[in-house]
Each structure stands twice: as C-alpha cells, then as structure tokens.
C-alpha cells in the first residue's frame, strides 16, 4: 500500500466514507483517492512524493494557481487581527463594493459561508418576494445540497447514481420542477400551465456539474424573456462561473442579466465563502430590512473576505487576464482532440473562459445531461488513471468540469498534451 491508501483506510475509520465530499472518494473512476500535502502554482504534491499538473484547481477557486502570494499575504496580514468577531468589519463592505462594481446586476449582496447557503437563501428570497412556492431547475445542474435542490441534481449526485437523494421529502420535491437544460421550448410549455405559481428559475448559465455544458444560442435569453413575462425571479448560479468565465461572470459573457446571482469558490480565494445578491428591490426583503430571514455566525468572515478581495483585485488588474486564460484552454483542448484523433478515439470538447470539458463520444457536440450520460464512461476511467500515472490530475468523474489557471505555463500545457498522446496510444 502507498501512503495515500494508508491514509484513506485511516480516514474511513472516523470520517463517513473517508471523505468530506462524495466525489473525492473516486467512485466515478474507481481506485483510491490521492492525499495531497501542498500545492504551488499549477502543481499539487501528494503524500507519496508525486508531483501533478493540476486541472481540478480545488474545483474552480484556484484561478491564480495554488498559494498565490498576493492572496497568501492578504490572509497573513488579517490573521494577526483575529479570526472571527461575529460583528461587522470594513473588509466585508470592501468585498461587497468590489462585487457590485464587477457585476452590474448585483446592487446589494449578502455574505454566507458556502455556495449551498447562497443558493438556498436566494431561493427562499425569491419565494418570499413573489409569494409563490414552485421553482424550476434543470436536469444535471447542481445548486448545492439543500433539500429542494437535490432533485435530479448534478455533480457528485450524478457520480453516485442518486441524482434525487433519499431523505428529500416528497412534499419538498413536488415544488421542484426539473426540465431539460438547453430546451427553452420545454420551459415555455410548462410555464403555460403553472407560470403564475413559479417563484424562480435557477440555472447554471454554464452547466459545470454535468461536465462543461454551454448554453445554446437563445437559451439564457429565452429564460430572461419568460421570467419577465410571468413575473418570475431569474437566478444565475454563478458559484462556478463567477469570475471564472469572465470578470463579470457568465452573465457578462453571454450578455444576459439575472435578477439574483449566487457566487462562491473564487469569491473566497480558496477559503469557504458564498454570496448572493441582485436587485435592491428584492434584496431589501431580507432581514433586518424585510421579513425574509437569513443569518450565519461566520458570514462575512474577515479572513475569507480578505482572501476574496485580494483575488478579485489581482483578476481586475490585468485587462487581458481572461483572454490569456482562454488561449491556454484552447491550446490544451485542441491538443487533446488532435492526439485523440491520431489514435482514432472519438472525443469532443467544450470550452468557455477558464473551464473545459472532455467527452469520449463520436458525437460532434454535447449539449445536455442525456448526451453526457451517453459518453463512454469506461474509456474515461482508463484514461483518468493513465493520466494520473503521467502526473496529470483531472476531475475524477465524467460529470465534472476541469479548470486551468494563470499559473499553467506553455510547458505545462505541452507536457499535458504529450502525456495525453501516450495515454491515448494505450487506450487503442
């Protein structure tokens, strides 16, 4: 047994399943998870002394690479002042101002401690504001693990094969209508029946929890139009896409403005944090201004706020940051596709901003959950473990997106492409 296997066995004796988030258990690819000791730049280092080029990026937040010095310095400075006060701090306001500056649809925000909290609170707000109960979400999209949203969910719920989790009461699930992502006609038809009962439509503008599925032309625009027509709150779940697709998020990239937005991951610079925000008229309904309750002991934690502010300051300094990031992703995915073609392996890729998804399929495009599920999962599993042997760490599920960071060099990308070529040759 290597040291990761020893530690995983130890973890299983005191942690349920040996992990604190299901996808980390490697159920989607088989084998045992890797235990890491540190990260620096584009690299991760495990307990057995192995070095990996990292395309998981802590599931998105590490857009500047691991242990970015400006973020680390901000954390160190604020650590000396104390960890948590349970009271207002100026740095909360500073981060809120930065978010409102970068995402024009957000006029007021509320800090929370996770993406799940953000989406849960945004939906409660939408229900309280509209006085309606039903919500619409899309198959394969993941919005955290609150009960109302674990109905045909994405991410690890798909990997486990239980997209609708046991423990979700039928009375909760009956208010959640789950439709096909990228099918605006289906939304149109269901709203003709129950449009006046729907409080909100929540959507990942890029569905990053069933791999990387991009919105087809007119889908997001159609949602905006239908929400306006029926008085429905449009919520963009940008926990993954916020500051990852563009500086103003996917809503800037696709030029569609939601009523409410949820953020996480990058917004905390790698520390636990979530934010929801949007139009003043809606946000003023939250306590203490309004009757809709939301609270949290660690909300606005000064250490998380300092990390998030430092990261956003770095991202907003370089006007070419996202262009450069996308060039790297394009080079990487074109390299993957070229090597796959050389070995007669069917593959397609989706790319947006600093996100990318690889699909083992002969289809020319993949646009929804059903098409993702038709990809060759057994081939992916073999590919995954062979890439690990080559020192390349990718997300361990066909239903997860991969990420690139500004720390990835041209050599890192070329080394990854070369590794993929050797792996594809073994898959034939």
Curated annotation (Swiss-Prot):
Keywords: Cytoplasm, Isomerase, Porphyrin biosynthesis, Pyridoxal phosphate. GO terms for cellular component: cytoplasm. Homodimer. Its EC number is 5.4.3.8. The gene is hemL. It comes from the Bacteria. It comes from Vesicomyosocius okutanii subsp. Calyptogena okutanii (strain HA). GO terms for molecular function: glutamate-1-semialdehyde 2,1-aminomutase activity; pyridoxal phosphate binding; transaminase activity. One of its GO terms (biological process) is protoporphyrinogen IX biosynthetic process. Belongs to the class-III pyridoxal-phosphate-dependent aminotransferase family. HemL subfamily. This is Glutamate-1-semialdehyde 2,1-aminomutase.
């Amino acid at each position: 047994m290597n040291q990761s296997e020893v530690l995983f066995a130890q973890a299983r004796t005191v942690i349920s399943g040996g992990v604190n988030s299901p996808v980390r258990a490697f159920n989607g690819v088989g084998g045992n998870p890797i235990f890491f000791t540190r990260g620096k730049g584009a690299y991760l280092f495990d307990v057995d002394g192995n070095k990996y080029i990292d395309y998981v990026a802590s599931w998105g937040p590490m857009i500047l690479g691991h242990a970015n010095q400006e973020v680390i310095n901000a954390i160190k400075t604020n650590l000396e002042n104390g960890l948590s006060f349970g009271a207002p701090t100026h740095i909360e306001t500073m981060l809120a101002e930065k978010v409102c500056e970068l995402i024009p649809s957000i006029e007021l925000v509320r800090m929370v401690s996770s993406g799940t909290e953000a989406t849960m609170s945004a939906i409660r707000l939408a229900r309280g504001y509209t006085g309606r109960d039903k919500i619409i979400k899309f198959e394969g999209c993941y919005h955290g693990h609150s009960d109302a949203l674990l109905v045909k969910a994405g991410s690890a719920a798909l990997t486990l094969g239980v997209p609708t989790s046991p423990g979700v009461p039928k009375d909760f699930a009956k208010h959640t209508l789950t439709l096909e992502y990228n099918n605006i006609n289906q939304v149109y038809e269901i709203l003709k029946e129950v449009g006046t009962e729907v409080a909100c439509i929540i959507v990942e503008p890029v569905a990053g929890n069933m791999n990387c599925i991009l919105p087809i032309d007119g889908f997001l625009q159609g949602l905006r139009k239908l929400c306006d027509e029926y008085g429905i709150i449009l919520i963009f779940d940008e926990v993954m896409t916020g500051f990852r697709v563009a500086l103003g998020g996917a809503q800037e990239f696709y030029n569609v403005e939601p009523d409410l937005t949820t953020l996480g991951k990058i917004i905390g610079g790698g520390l636990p944090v979530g934010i929801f925000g949007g139009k003043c008229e809606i946000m003023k309904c939250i306590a203490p201004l309004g009757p809709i309750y939301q609270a949290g002991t660690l909300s606005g934690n000064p250490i998380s706020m300092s990390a998030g502010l430092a990261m956003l300051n770095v991202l907003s300094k370089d006007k070419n940051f996202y262009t450069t990031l996308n060039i790297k992703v394009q080079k990487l995915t074109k390299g993957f596709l070229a090597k796959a073609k050389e070995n007669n392996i069917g593959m397609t890729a989706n790319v947006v901003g600093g996100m990318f998804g690889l699909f083992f399929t002969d289809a020319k495009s993949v646009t929804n959950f059903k098409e993702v599920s038709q990809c060759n999962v057994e081939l992916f599993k073999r590919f995954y473990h062979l890439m690990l042997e080559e020192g390349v760490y990718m997300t361990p599920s066909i239903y997860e997106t991969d990420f690139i960071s500004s720390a990835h060099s041209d050599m890192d990308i070329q080394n990854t492409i070369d590794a993929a070529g050797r792996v594809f040759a073994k898959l034939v």
